[in-house]
Each structure stands twice: as C-alpha cells, then as structure tokens.
C-alpha cells in the first residue's frame, strides 16, 4: 500500500529513519498527470531500491507569465492509484505553501545550459526546475533519482546541478517510452485530434531518418536538419518550431558533428506542443 505524505516535516522524518537503517531510496520527481513514461521510472526504482518515493508537486516556479499554472492537470487520486499498482512506497505531495513558505531569499540561476532549446523559449523555466529539484533532493535524500531522456535538456541540467552542488545522488536517465507506432508518450498527446495523432508518429520517424543519415557518415548538421525538416513538412500539418543539433550533454550547437549529439524536435499542433529527441554518437 502506497503511503501519501503531504508535509515536508513528515517526509524528512521518514527519510532520516531510513538513512539510519541503511535503506536505499529511489526517487522520481514529477508534476503528476502520470503516464507510462513515469511508471517505467517507478518500476526501475522499485527493482533497485528498498524504498521508492514519487513526488507529485506542480511547481509554480517553472511556469512563465504566459503559462497557466492553475490550469495544469491535477489528479492526485489517480496518480496514487497508478504508482501503487507498480509498487511505489511513498507519494510525496506537499502544498505550495509548505515547499515555499515565504519569498525565496536565494535564486538559483542555471547559466548557459538553459540559454538554448526549451530554455530559450521559456526564460526562467529551468531556474525553477533546478530550485525545486534541489529542494526535493534535500528533503528526500535519495540514493538514486530517475529522469526521462524525453526531457534531455532537463536531464543534462540536473546532472550538472548534482555535480556543482555535490549532491550524494546518482542520476539515472531512462529511455523514452513510446507508443507501439513510435510516438513518445506524453500527457499532451490527449490534446491531439485524430488526424494530428496519425501525423505525430512522423516525429519519431524523422529522428530515425536523422540517425540513418548519421550512420551513413553525414556529419554536417545543416544537411541533417534540412532533410528532417523536409520530411516533417511533407508529413505533418503542425508548425515546426525547432529542428536542432547540439552536443550532449554540453548543449553546444553543432555545425560539424563530433562526439555525442542530441537531435531535438518541437512541433506545435492545434492544442499540443510535442517534443522528441534522439541522442546518438560516441560519448
């Protein structure tokens, strides 16, 4: 039976007792509205750790002025049921007032890693992400924390934060979970029309095209970007917002490809903005 914890104080009390007994803690931070991608991370943690904690907290700091914090889907009862079915031990669901009891005296700024891709479109977003993850790590004190590679920029930023702040946690990146036809699973997929849902499969297919070009020896980013863009333009009605090639995890834009790279897509359909990516090349 999964236990619901709603206060920072109680969560810290449980964690301190667990640490004294040598218990390993796995942690999956989420904003709720859970889907199979989240549950894959929970299963991975359950198979590895003595205790698995899932946080469900809609973090106001990562919402911009034109993003509706109040409209973000909240379904704690459903989320609790889902993680219970896959073996999570604790759901940590604090109130905003408990996580942020007063105005923050210290702001965390991410730096260059947040100046590109999603961060460039949502100024301050990753500052909010890093602030809440930093706080959650201090509260939960996990041995392992699980993040999806679908949000690859976020994963790179969290890994850098752990290094810079000397957190005693190992970050585990979990591969993108996809539908049978290749579409990356996302809570946003429900907003697609039937036609858009049929078209959306071409995001992952365009990434496979990029991978094939790379494997055939193509190292000019512009060639890959142009061919992926042309493919998408001929297969989807949505607006292509981004096709980009960056080094990973440094997130430096690439022209002549060397080393490990991250090919990122963003497409805006009528009521849903979908992202997808592929990481390829030697580390």
UniProtKB/Swiss-Prot annotation:
It is found in: Cytoplasm. The active site is at 38 (proton donor). InterPro entries: Pantoate_ligase, Pantoate_ligase_C, Rossmann-like_a/b/a_fold. Beta-alanine binds at residue 62. Its EC number is 6.3.2.1. It comes from the Bacteria. It catalyses: (R)-pantoate + beta-alanine + ATP = (R)-pantothenate + AMP + diphosphate + H(+). The keyword Nucleotide-binding applies. (R)-pantoate binds at residues 62, 154. This is Pantothenate synthetase. Catalyzes the condensation of pantoate with beta-alanine in an ATP-dependent reaction via a pantoyl-adenylate intermediate. It comes from Staphylococcus aureus (strain MRSA252). Transmembrane segments: none annotated. Belongs to the pantothenate synthetase family. Homodimer. One of its GO terms (molecular function) is pantoate-beta-alanine ligase activity. The keyword Cytoplasm applies. NCBIfam families: panC (TIGR00018). The reaction proceeds by a bi uni uni bi ping pong mechanism. ATP binds at residues 31-38, 148-151, 177, 185-188. GO terms for biological process: pantothenate biosynthetic process.
């Amino acid at each position: 039976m999964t236990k619901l914890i709603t206060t920072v104080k109680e969560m810290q009390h449980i964690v301190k007792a667990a640490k004294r007994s040598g218990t390993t803690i796995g942690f999956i931070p989420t904003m709720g509205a859970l889907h199979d991608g989240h549950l894959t991370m929970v299963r991975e943690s359950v198979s590895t750790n003595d205790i698995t904690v899932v946080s469900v907290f809609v973090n106001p700091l990562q919402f911009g002025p034109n993003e509706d914090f109040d409209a973000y889907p909240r379904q704690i009862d459903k989320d609790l049921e889902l993680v219970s079915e896959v073996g999570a031990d604790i759901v940590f669901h604090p109130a905003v007032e408990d996580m942020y009891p007063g105005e923050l005296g210290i702001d965390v700024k991410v730096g260059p890693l947040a100046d590109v891709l999603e961060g460039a479109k949502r100024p301050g977003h990753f500052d909010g992400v890093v602030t809440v993850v930093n706080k959650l790590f201090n509260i939960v004190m996990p041995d392992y924390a699980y993040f999806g590679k679908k949000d690859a920029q976020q994963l790179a930023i969290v890994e850098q934060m752990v290094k810079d702040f000397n957190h005693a946690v190992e970050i585990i990146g979990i591969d993108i979970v996809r539908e049978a036809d290749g579409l990356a699973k996302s809570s946003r997929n429900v907003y697609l029309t039937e036609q858009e849902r049929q078209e959306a499969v071409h995001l992952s297919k365009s990434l496979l095209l990029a991978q094939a070009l790379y494997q055939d020896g193509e190292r000019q980013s512009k060639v890959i970007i142009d061919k992926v863009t042309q493919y998408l333009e001929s297969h989807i009605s949505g607006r292509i917002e981004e096709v980009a090639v960056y080094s990973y995890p440094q997130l430096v834009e690439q022209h002549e490809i060397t080393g490990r790279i991250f090919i990122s897509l963003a497409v805006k359909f009528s009521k849903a903005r979908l992202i997808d990516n592929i990481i390829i090349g030697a580390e």
